[in-house]
Amino acid sequence: MTKHMMRRRTALTTLSLGLLASCSTAKPKIPGAQVPVLPDTGALAVAVDAPAVTLPPAHALASWPQQLANAAHAPGNVAGPTGLAVHWTALVGMGGGFRQPLLASPLLAQDLVFAMDANAAVSAFSVATGHPVWHASTRPKHATEQNIGGGMAYGSGRLYVSTGYGELIAMAAGNGKVLWRQKLDFPPRTAPMIAGSLVALIVQNDLLLTFDAESGTPGWRFTGAVGTPGSTGVAVTGAPAFADGILVAGFASGTLAALNANSGTPIWEQSYASAFGQASSLDFSDIVGAPVIAKGVVYAISLGATVMAVDLHSGAKVWTHTATGTQALCLAGDFAFVLDHNQMLFAVHADDGLVSWALQMPQFHNMKKKTGPLQWAGPVMVNGQLVLTSSRGEIAFVDALQGRIKSTTKLVAPADLPPIAAGGLLLQLTRNGTLTAYS
């Protein structure tokens, strides 16, 4: 890896982790001119003729087997507990920090909750009691590198784990036994995505890799890199999405690509790249949040100041806005809910892009002095409310119809992931490695 790649990866990793190392201790000012790395796009304008937000009824999920619940990344309005009574807590292992973030979403399947710690050690817990069922280290015997990136996905009794040690591992979900493992070209940027017999992920050099779920045999591959070969981006990003035989992936280059899931043949590409005009080492265009597919349309947001809806089959733009963000959009019924990098939350009509409401989430620990910037993760929708978590260690519930914060509750620690909702529980992993089940 070149020095340029390492510098850019370090900068982008810092960006994607949402200032994990920030603290209240005063630091001396660094001399020199400050150069913004993200464009200040301003807020999306609420349209006077935008329709009022409507929502579909909440539906219960028995499982949450992969990132954002399913291969399309569109769980919708999920039914969950109406309160936050702690049902159980468990320690998953090593907590996250600036150098080793804890960004793998927990999963629920086969009456087990799966979690991965900052060292990529995987644990399974009873969904009923939180008692540990099995624990497995994925660290190779002679590994010297730190784990950054990766995640998990479940399918047909198997748990698929991508690790920052540059491996994809298939385990028996019931006991953690390794069934097969594949060495990757580079460490992964994403968790695996499973669609039938296909396992797909993206590695750090912007290469999309596929594997046979049963045997681990490598399949087709596709490069999303543009320009300098091997250039890299944000270290931890969202998994590819799948629907109607089409796999959609976002890359560090700002390219959103749709591919035939069977052959890897490109169907279309759209650019979410920045026109910010910085040097290539600073001009960030990464599509960090996972793309979402709903009703034949793909939704994604990039660091290149683009949020766009694209027809899944043709690649035609449905609508586009100028906004920068790292969180996957939340789709529910006829509306998309968008969180931008200024911690503004928007309700956008999915058909035409009209903005129905905008809400400024708290931006700072100290709002008066505007110190201690906050980062919010999410949203996901539970019982018709948008749920977000913060780097201050709070969980917020937002009225999705009106765009107002209904309540906030303190978590046991800061959170860099939104919760998952399945099996009658709300499950939250916090930065200190604590997994909490609410009922």
What is each stretch, according to the model?
Residues 88-107, 135-153, 179-196, 218-243, ...:
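Extracytoplasmic beta-rich repeat domains
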